Amino acid sequence: MIEIKDKKDCCGCNACVQVCPKQCISMHEDGEGFLYPKVNTDLCINCHLCEKVCPVITQDTPKEPIKVYATKNPDETIRLESSSGGIFTLLAEKVIDNNGIVFGAKFNEHWEVIHDYTITKEGITNFRGSKYVQSRIGNTFKDTENFLKEGRLVLFSGTPCQIAGLKKFLRKEYDNLITVDFICHGVPSPGVFRWYLCEELSKIAHKGDKKFSFALRPIYSIPKADAIAKECGFEIEKHTYDLENEVEFWENIETEHEKMFKEQGIKIKALIARK
């Protein structure tokens, strides 16, 4: 059974909870606001499925990219509402056009970041932009599997750890599944964000639709942001692909595609196709 002795050994993907046939695993929040699995040993039948779907315990061999593209969304408005050139929206709209399902992270009515799905292009808007908080996956791995078995085209967007957890949970390859992840520096605490909202939300004036966006100011550099990040993910020895190739490609974009790099709403534009 899953037994967390060191918090670094859990990425919080929730795969173990969703795969358990006896529903004896639940996620509990620690003092820092992160969720970790807890097993009800009275109900556990020692099937070890939770261990088999854990992306930390059972790691895959790193995979090489099939192709790498430098690309962007031609719509500047969408680029400015998005991250990394707005490519997610292009992919998601194509999936919706093919009667597919799109999963992503969004804010709920309580300003919590959760994973959800949409079957409409209007729903894609909620998934745009960076959300520097660990999302609550819920039962979206189960939902994804059900849609895949129905033959629906599915796009699932999440952190590298969440994508690894999803693929472990599915335990087979699906030709009708597209996964989208991103360069991740570690997920900040939902607990810290909750505290911030309690302290500051009353001071924030929203105009029109209620929206919340994140930005890292220079004073809050990546090393400082690590202070509220989960102890995992970026420290896992193996990745689902060769990250060095991705970073090298990204660094070459500025010189090899200067016009694209200077346009509004462009940060990282590397689209990597891999199996």
Label the predicted regions.
Residues 1-19, 23-26, 244, 258, ...:
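Ferredoxin-type iron-sulfur electron-transfer modules and their immediate structural context
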Residues 11-13, 24, 47-50, 184, ...:
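Generic recognition of cysteine residues
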Residues 55, 61-275:
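Iron-sulfur-associated redox domains of electron-transfer enzymes in respiratory
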